[in-house]
Regions:
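Conserved GNAT acetyl-CoA-binding A-motif
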Residues: 153-165
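Conserved beta-strand-loop-alpha-helix junction that forms the acyl-donor binding cleft
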Residues: 137, 163-173
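A short beta-loop-alpha structural element at the N-terminal edge
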Residues: 11-23
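Acetyl-CoA-dependent GNAT
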Residues: 41-135, 146, 206-207
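Conserved acetyl-CoA-binding loop-helix of GNAT-fold acetyltransferases
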Residues: 138-151, 174-178
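Conserved catalytic-core motifs of GNAT/GCN5-like acyltransferases
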Residues: 112, 120, 162-165, 182-199
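Helix-loop element at the rim of GNAT/NAT acetyltransferase active sites that forms part
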Residues: 25-42, 54-58
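Conserved active-site tyrosine of GNAT-family acetyltransferases
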Residues: 27, 176, 181
Length: 208
């Protein structure tokens, strides 16, 4: 079966610390929008490092979705998909090869699995989070990440996945519904978003 060119444009892999600057930028953009996370103030890369280390220590996964740049396309005028490098005089050196087979551009979205609850008995259940950079929305990247995470979660002993979503966030609720998530809970007005009460919907999915 021939690979869809659109599918070949992106790569999802486990994030590393070098990815945290891009991950932090995307998360902070979501914080300012006030509709996807209950974090009220922008976070620093150092704070995200502690978050990342906690995920690594508990074998919870953080994934980065980045574009893959075709070497033949990277130098074309108007091509914005590839991360470009410049010399000290500002000369465009083109997209620089990082991997052996592909050139990799910037991170456009990221997702994670986190502990649903710190007590040991809840280890079979994880919370999923997915964020896309503002300029990358509307491209189906969240869908790609959710699909990837669902396929890989059982390898790490995860049997149930839940999402914590503001009840007013119809786009996110619809995204998870497409993957068979059903409403497992509703917490009315449990969040204060700087004076605006938000209810929380909890979609869940059993992976067995």
């Amino acid at each position: 079966m021939q690979e869809n060119p659109a599918d070949a444009k992106y790569e999802i892999s486990r994030a590393v610390k070098a990815d945290l600057a891009a991950i932090t930028r995307t998360y902070n953009a979501s914080i300012l929008e006030r509709n996807t996370t209950a974090t009220l103030h922008p976070v620093s890369i150092e704070e995200r490092e502690a978050w990342f280390d906690a995920h690594e220590a508990t074998n919870r996964q953080v994934y980065a979705l980045r574009e893959i740049c075709d070497e033949n396309l990277a130098g074309k005028d108007g091509e914005a998909d590839c991360e470009r490098k410049f010399d000290s005089d500002g000369k465009n050196l083109g997209a620089q090869k990082i991997g052996a087979a592909n050139q990799k551009g910037k991170i456009l979205a990221w997702g994670s699995l986190s502990d649903y609850h710190p007590r040991e008995g809840y280890r079979i259940t994880a919370e999923i989070s997915v964020y896309a950079a503002p300029e990358a929305r509307g491209k189906g990247l969240g869908k790609r990440l959710v699909k990837f995470i669902l396929e890989n979660a059982p390898k790490f002993g995860v049997k149930n996945i839940v999402a914590l979503i503001f009840s007013s966030n119809a786009a996110s609720l619809n995204l998870f519904a497409k993957f068979g998530f059903t409403r497992w809970g509703e917490l009315p007005e449990v969040c204060d978003m700087s004076g605006k009460p938000e209810s929380l919907t909890i979609p869940g999915k059993n992976l067995s």
